[in-house]
Amino acid sequence: MAAIVFRRRDHVINVFIMPHVSGPMRRQELRRNGYNIESWSDGEYDFWAVSDLNRDELDMLTKLLGA
């Protein structure tokens, strides 16, 4: 597993990357304990972006990353 850390203003965004294990992974958007979480897969790797950044701005970043 790898992690990349981004910063947008005062918000930290963690993107976790791990090898895809099996089966299709559909894009998901969740909110837990004040954090927005987006996950997606490119078929080879699974990605999880986690931040207290608002949903729209986190979505912009994940789209730039290929979600």
Describe these PLM feature segments.
Residues 1-67:
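Polar, acidic low-complexity tracts enriched in Ser/Thr/Gln/Glu with frequent Gly/Pro and Thr-Pro motifs
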